[in-house]
A protein has these predicted regions:
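Short acidic/His/Gly/Ser-rich catalytic and metal-binding motifs that mark active-site loops
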Residues: 16-20, 30, 127-131, 197-202, ...
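Membrane-interface junctions of multi-pass transporters
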Residues: 296-320
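Disulfide-bonded cysteines in secreted/extracellular proteins and peptides
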Residues: 14, 18-21, 270, 276, ...
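Radical SAM enzyme [4Fe-4S]-AdoMet core and its adjacent flexible, acidic
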Residues: 134-143, 150, 155-275, 281, ...
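Conserved alpha-helical substructure of the radical SAM core
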Residues: 1-110, 114-116
Length: 320
């Protein structure tokens, strides 16, 4: 049975202060804003359990944050050593990392290439669209992130561009798409920033106070309306389709999965089958959560839930 594990080696720590970042805001309100940097001991214990469970099946490791590269190069070099040591069944291993790209240099690229990483690089388009992604000192990060992308192209590292689909990006999707094409970016993922419904899990309305706590008013300046999103989908799909018909295909993950669904194939994107994929999320201190979003809330820490309930609420199923 394939096993998918997301590790947060730097917890919520990040060198950027993106204006729309929900994770930075919510993590600041939890009892423990950061779970600290992941130790070699925690990494080793996690990988041992993963390889023991997987046997000869695939182990998929995804590193996210915060900014996972803050864990340092030695951490990822040690990762490679531990995999070689513990993967006694020679199970196939996939490694992914999601980064803002500002720390990427040539040595990082060599690490990515050597480990066969798939890198997700956050870049919201051209310099105008990327103005919401600033560092801790309020400085723009566009040129640093773009330089990281260029270095990965130089070293032949596989990477996707991850775009937070704000209102500003959606309204300028044509020039932004042309910018990505000009940079020869072949794989794009758009992550919609939509206002959440004012209802709880049972469908009952939630109070304005609770809504505002979960969704700060400043972020409403960047979130799309349903109309914004609809217009984006139409414009972007038209460009995607034209490029496909002209033999100039650029992968856009959401549309690729729409095509898979139209062909009665299973989508690979989380949530497109009507439910979240089964995944373990390991925080910097080794706490385990059932999903990435749940890791922002102390209540979902496995130490607070009886093991019998954990097993019932997050059943494992074969990964097709």
């Amino acid at each position: 049975m394939n096993i998918s594990i997301m590790l947060k080696p730097a917890s919520s720590n990040c060198n950027l202060r993106c204006k729309y970042c929900f994770y930075n805001d919510l993590s600041s309100h939890r009892e423990m804003p950061s779970h600290g940097m992941m130790s070699e001991q925690t990494l080793r214990a996690t990988l041992k359990k993963a390889f023991d469970f997987a046997g000869h099946d695939r182990v998929m490791l995804s590193f996210q944050g915060g900014e996972p590269l803050l864990a340092g190069k030695e951490f990822f070099l040690k990762l490679h050593d531990i995999i070689r040591e513990l993967n006694v069944n020679r199970a196939p291993v996939s490694i992914g990392v999601q980064t803002n790209g500002t720390l990427i240099d040539e040595e990082w690229c060599r690490i990515f290439k050597r480990g066969g990483y798939l890198v997700g690089l956050s870049l919201d388009g051209d310099e105008v669209a990327d103005s919401l992604r600033i560092d801790a000192n309020g400085n723009p990060t566009f040129s640093r992130a773009l330089n990281g992308a260029k270095l990965m192209q130089k070293y032949g590292v596989d990477f996707n561009i991850l775009v937070v689909l704000t209102k500003q990006v959606a309204n300028r999707i044509e020039p932004i798409y042309r910018f990505f094409k000009k940079q020869n970016f072949k794989h794009l993922q758009f992550i919609p920033m939509l206002k959440p419904l004012r209802v709880d899990e049972s469908g009952k309305p939630i109070s304005k106070t609770t809504y505002n706590e979960c969704f700060p008013s400043e972020q409403e300046n960047y979130s799309m309306s349903a109309e914004d999103y609809s217009e984006f989908l139409q414009k972007c799909f038209a460009m995607y389709l034209k490029d496909c018909m002209d033999g100039k295909y650029t992968s856009i993950r959401q549309f690729d999965n729409f095509v898979r669904l139209a062909r009665f194939e299973c989508p690979e994107q989380c949530g497109m089958e009507g439910h979240c994929c089964h995944q373990f999320v390991i925080e910097g201190d080794g706490e385990v959560y059932p999903t990435f979003i749940a890791s922002i809330a102390t209540i979902w820490a496995t130490s607070t839930i009886p093991i019998s309930l954990r097993c019932q609420s997050t059943p494992l199923q074969p990964n097709s």
